[in-house]
Amino acid sequence: AKGMDQWTYVGNRVIHGPNWKVAYDGYLEGYHFKAAHPETIEPRTYSNVMEYDAHGPHLLVGFAAKTMMTLGEVEQNELWQHETRGYDFIRLFFPNVSIFVAPEITQVAQMIPGPGPLENTTITHFLHPKPPENDQNQAERIQMADWLRDVVQEEH
């Protein structure tokens, strides 16, 4: 996102999971939303509607939200201004980094293979485009970082 170098760092979380390629596939498709994330992602995002845009080895994956039809009146050249209000993107940078931008927080994740062949360590970093206004605002951001970690770690 434009100006990301000026964003505020919220913190990081570490997640231990399965083989990194298996875990990375979760960013590539939404078919697992209904089964793996029935309480968090599935209520707002379709499990079977995705769009892929390749940029060399990198991918932009779009997921349609259940509010997508509200974008019908938006001019096509202005749709980019409505991210997270009708659709979400995961930006995948080869070989193992993903970025998810949401109004509440932005997550930058890096999956690192190992220590064994059936394991990975995912380090997630959280950013926000504006500094927190107060302690409560900072606490809400920390809570969102914890929630995003829990979606992956506990809802699998």
Task: Describe the predicted segments one by one.
Residues 1-156:
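C-terminal catalytic domain of Rieske-type non-heme iron oxygenases
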